[in-house]
């Protein structure tokens, strides 16, 4: 089936020029159930999605916080240009590496992309491993004030100098009730909580914001989570990281440094980039290469563990074991289930 001639990657707004409540118009446009395809890094989501899209007459929306950036190609295992020409993809290569892109931007742009796809009687297929972005799509954008970059930079310097545990102790003094609900190692939530206190003058626990995951109400979704045995996934990740280095990941990091990736605190801290930025900053010592490579692999494996934990919160993502199955067979299983129950 030939993909329609549509410039999917041209969607570049940050949400200010789309409808204020996109879910309301979403319900009017709904004709088919939206497919959610998740899985840990290295589980084969991309290959499965490319097989699945023609089976269901679908178009693909990337659920990846780093694939939005032009030039971050090797380290994000970005789908090839040839594949994007065959099957329309959204939310890939839409930002310069210095631009900030957050969950609110994702919510509006992903919603706009799905509206576009549904309006042409196609099936949106959301594909990725970012549990937070899936949560945002299903539950709406995060509540609370927008991020304060200057304050976050201040906290980053504090952590670098004093450590995260002291920052957590600070939160415990300012908002002990909320601090008890998170771990002392959850840097993102600690920083966000202190940021909210700084911006609003109120404790997080005093705000009437919902922090729980919600099921989508205004449109139907059906989700799958690709599952592989841990030892197999570990072997795949080791091979994947080595191949990225063989494909000149370090050269890509050099180019991104020239383009100003340091100005973007999210992009510069992404796995696969932060390790090699530090390596380059140290003068690229040959004796440190193996240690940095092993750290790159270890950080990826730790992230996979977090991905598994996140998606366990969502029963709507049906676990789909993939051991011994080809991407095409997995896609056929999803398509069959989709047409039976979607």
From Swiss-Prot:
Its EC number is 2.5.1.75. GO terms for biological process: tRNA modification. GO terms for molecular function: ATP binding; tRNA dimethylallyltransferase activity. Keywords: ATP-binding, Magnesium, Nucleotide-binding, Transferase, tRNA processing. It catalyses: adenosine(37) in tRNA + dimethylallyl diphosphate = N(6)-dimethylallyladenosine(37) in tRNA + diphosphate. It comes from the Bacteria. InterPro entries: Dimethylallyltransferase, IPT, P-loop_NTPase. Residues 64-67 are annotated as: Interaction with substrate tRNA. Disulfide bonds: none annotated. The record marks 130, 152 as: Interaction with substrate tRNA. Its cofactor is Mg(2+). ATP binds at residues 39-46. Substrate binds at residues 41-46. It holds the Pfam family IPPT. The keyword ATP-binding applies. Monomer. PANTHER family: TRNA DIMETHYLALLYLTRANSFERASE. Belongs to the IPP transferase family. Catalyzes the transfer of a dimethylallyl group onto the adenine at position 37 in tRNAs that read codons beginning with uridine, leading to the formation of N6-(dimethylallyl)adenosine (i(6)A). This is tRNA dimethylallyltransferase. It comes from Chlamydia felis (strain Fe/C-56) (Chlamydophila felis). The lineage of its organism: Bacteria, Pseudomonadati, Chlamydiota, Chlamydiia, Chlamydiales.
């Amino acid at each position: 089936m030939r993909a329609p001639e549509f410039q999917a990657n041209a969607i570049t707004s940050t949400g200010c020029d789309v409808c204020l409540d996109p879910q309301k118009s979403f319900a009017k446009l709904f004709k088919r159930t939206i497919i959610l395809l998740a899985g840990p890094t290295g589980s084969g989501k991309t290959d499965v999605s490319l097989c699945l899209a023609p089976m269901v007459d679908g178009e693909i929306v990337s659920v990846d916080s780093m694939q939005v950036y032009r030039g971050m190609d090797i380290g994000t295992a970005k789908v090839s240009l040839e594949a994007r020409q065959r099957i329309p993809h959204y939310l890939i290569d839409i930002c310069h590496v210095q631009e900030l892109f957050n969950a609110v931007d994702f919510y509006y742009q992903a919603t706009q992309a799905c509206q576009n796809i549904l309006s042409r009687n196609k099936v949106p297929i959301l594909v990725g491993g970012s549990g937070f972005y899936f949560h945002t799509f299903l539950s709406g954008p995060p509540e609370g004030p927008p991020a304060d970059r200057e304050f976050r930079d201040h906290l980053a310097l504090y952590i670098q100098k004093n450590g995260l545990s002291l920052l957590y102790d600070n939160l415990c003094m300012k908002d002990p009730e909320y601090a008890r609900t998170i771990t002392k190692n959850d840097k993102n939530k600690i920083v966000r909580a202190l940021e909210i206190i700084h911006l609003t003058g109120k404790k997080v626990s005093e705000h009437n914001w919902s922090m729980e995951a919600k099921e989508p109400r205004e449109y139907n979704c059906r989700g799958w989570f690709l599952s592989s045995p841990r030892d197999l996934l570990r072997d795949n990740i080791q091979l994947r990281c080595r191949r990225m280095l063989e494909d000149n990941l370090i050269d890509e990091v050099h180019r991104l440094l020239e383009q100003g990736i340091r100005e973007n605190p999210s992009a510069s801290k992404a796995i696969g980039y932060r390790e090699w930025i530090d390596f380059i900053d140290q003068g690229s010592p040959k004796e440190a290469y193996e240690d940095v490579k092993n750290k790159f692999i270890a950080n990826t494996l730790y992230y996979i563990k977090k991905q598994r934990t996140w998606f366990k919160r969502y029963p709507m993502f049906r676990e789909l074991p993939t051991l011994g199955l080809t991407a095409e067979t997995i896609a056929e299983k999803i398509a069959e289930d989709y047409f039976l129950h979607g």
